[in-house]
Amino acid sequence: MTATLPTTPTADARIAELRGQIDQCDAEIIALVHRRLAVSQEIGELRRATGGTRLSLAREKQVLARFSAALGGDGAALGMLLLRQGRGRL
């Protein structure tokens, strides 16, 4: 077990400030995910309306490769979650 050092008012204030920045990042990420879902749903509707398949495996591979290259293994998992959100489970 590791001992924790007592924090100081200065450290507490900085931590609160940094957490505020994280909260702002989270809000931006959530907004972007909503935007991505709307775009993905429109693509799916257009593909189905024109007789296409619901999804494109080649495109999904591109997305996963991009997330993996940028963020590693966890990035691929994040990419898969976003794809699933947009198209539903297979």
Predicted features, each with a name:
Residues M1-L90:
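Domain-level signature for soluble enzymes in the chorismate/prephenate branch of the shikimate pathway
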